[in-house]
């Protein structure tokens, strides 16, 4: 699989599906998983719908750069990795789908690099802000 040097100390492993000329869709996995979370059939299906699909191992997962145990890194650093990957691929803007922690990174991308995002979709995620109120109980209640 190819790698992108997204910063002096971070190398990201990624995989592409589809045609380079199609709109780019970047898939961000959650904590404790890797690019394989996004199954190949799912990625090829999206590519068949007219997207260039990018799945990648975020820092400290899969084949990407590992950091010493206990090292801290931030959502802004992880967002910068995505921007570095887009730069490496020469992609001006992309549709971003983030799952769990990937959704938190996607939200940070939308805030800090909004012009690079065509759309942002967050799946099973939160903002990570502990100062926000809890979800409304009515919204969590079963319907029907």
Language-model features: where?
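Helical cap/lid subdomains and adjacent loops of hydrolase enzymes that gate the active-site channel
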Residues: 133-144
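Conserved HGGG/HGGXW glycine-rich cap/lid loop of the alpha/beta-hydrolase fold
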Residues: 6-68
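Active-site loop/oxyanion-hole signature of alpha/beta-hydrolase fold enzymes
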Residues: 61-101
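Conserved hydrolase catalytic core segment
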Residues: 92-135
